[in-house]
Each structure stands twice: as C-alpha cells, then as structure tokens.
C-alpha cells in the first residue's frame, strides 16, 4: 500500500509468515482484482503500463476514482512536477480529495507554508457508479471534436467502429443524468 512504510510492510510479512503462509493480501489483490481483469482483457496485461517518469512527458493526466493523497502519497510529487511542466490534470471522483486541491510538498519548506497547491485543473464530481457514463461522455466529446489519431486507431485497435456505434446510441441527456456531470464540464475535460 502507498500508505505503508517499508518497516511496517516488513513487520506485516513477518506476522503473516508466523501463520505458515507466504500469501500477503494487499491492495493489488483485494482492491484491484476487477481492474486487473479488465486491463488483461483490454490491453493484455493486468496492471498499469505507465510509470511516474511518464508523467514528465504527459500533456494531460486523468486521475479517475483515485485518492492519491490518501492512498498513493508518493504520486503527488510526480503530479506536481507534471503540472509544472504544463500538464493539465483532471480529477474524477465522487468526493474531492485534499491532496489534489491543496497539496503541500513535505520535503520543501516553502511547500509547507500557505494553503497548498491546487493540482487538479478540473475536478469532475461524478455520481457514484456514474464513471462509465462519464467516460462515454468524454469519448463522445473527443469523437465529435475530431481529435483522434486515426493512424494509431487503425493500426493498434480492434472494434473501433463498434465502439463508435455504441457511443452514438447514448444520448447526452442520459450521460448527464447517469454521471451527474454537466455536458459543458465533460466537454471541457475532453
């Protein structure tokens, strides 16, 4: 876990091994089982393929359903650096997360003073279970803007025409109702 120190993790594994097992349940198999299955089916690997070093090159980062300040505090420094590099950060979550709205860098004296740095350029407060509708809305907005890399899509994806067809079956009013986010905000995120 991003909240656990190396020392605590070491003690945890010593404790668990006293019960005769080397199986150490953690967030990777308790919280991310469904995401691992979905990623395996979608991109053929059940884990993230992005490293924090990739943030340095990003023009936009979407933090979806994640609370980095609470669960992955080491990620906040990388997000802060990405923002300094000109990256736009969109935070999507049912609740605002303090680390994304007033980050105070603990290793910089000036970072501890004041009210903190707002990392998220845009916060979309999605309704619980409305994330799929929101992502469909973002996809609809990107599709209608024409901001697509057709060469990449043709070369590396399967089923894009079916995906577009499924998006066309969804109305903006349904997206807004199910996600709890306005069409204007969704288009701004796209």
Q: Which stretches of residues belong to each language-model region?
A:
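Cofactor-pocket helix-loop regions in the catalytic cores of large enzyme subunits
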Residues: 1-190
């Amino acid at each position: 876990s991003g909240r656990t120190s190396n020392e605590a993790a070491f003690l945890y594994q010593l404790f668990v091994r006293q019960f005769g097992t080397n199986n150490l349940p953690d967030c990777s198999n308790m919280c991310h089982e469904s995401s691992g299955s979905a990623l395996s089916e979608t991109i053929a690997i059940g884990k993230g393929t992005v490293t924090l070093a990739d943030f340095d090159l990003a023009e936009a980062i979407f933090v979806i359903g994640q609370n980095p300040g609470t669960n992955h505090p080491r990620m906040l420094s990388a997000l802060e650096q990405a923002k300094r590099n000109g990256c736009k950060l969109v935070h999507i979550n049912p609740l605002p997360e303090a680390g994304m709205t007033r980050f105070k860098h603990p290793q910089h004296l000036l970072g501890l003073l004041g009210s903190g740095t707002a990392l998220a350029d845009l916060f979309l407060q999605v309704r619980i279970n409305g994330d799929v509708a929101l992502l469909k809305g973002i996809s609809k907005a990107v599709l209608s803007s024409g901001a697509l890399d057709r060469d990449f899509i043709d070369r590396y994806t399967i089923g894009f025409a079916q995906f577009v067809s499924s998006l066309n079956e969804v109305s903006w009013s349904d997206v807004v109702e199910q996600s709890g986010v306005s069409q204007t905000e969704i288009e701004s995120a796209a």
